[in-house]
Amino acid sequence: MSKPIVATTSLAGCFGCHMSLLDIDERILDLIELVDFNKSPIDDIKNFTQQCDIGLIEGGCCLDENVHVLEDFRKHCKILVSVGECAIMGGLPAMRNGIPIRECLEEAYLKGPTVRNSNEEKIMPNDEELPIMLDRVYPCHEVVKIDYFLPGCPPRADLIWNALVALVKNEEMDLPYEVFKFD
């Protein structure tokens, strides 16, 4: 019997959720026995090579490129899981949502204390190669259908492990309080 296929990606986030996944420590060897990875920074596969059973999404959508990646994951994954606060609610990147995008860019490139004296030409990046910023940061479920949510910033490794094993084995998730609590 073939192993379930898992894909992962990081959108507008810090990669902390992937680090938490790697924090399952030696259980990563057990995970490799349970699943194969496809399109993931974990195995450096950059494009889907087949349909996947489970997709783990970290980060929200703040660029048009994030939306395209998320839609591609929805198309290629039977089950899609939002992992972490950025994917679920927009997280820290969503702090810009109450500020018009132009003001955010001006603060970052023209007025901020770290750039005020270093950008005397008042240049703001504007190149067709750069991804287009969205008007706000969108949580994943506002863009595509999400099947499961794993909260935390980042979620604990035990939470990710328990949820992933339950999904792979087609079992009900047993997620006791301890896997949500972070000391």
List the predicted regions and their residue ranges:
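Iron-sulfur-associated redox domains of electron-transfer enzymes in respiratory
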Residues: 1-183
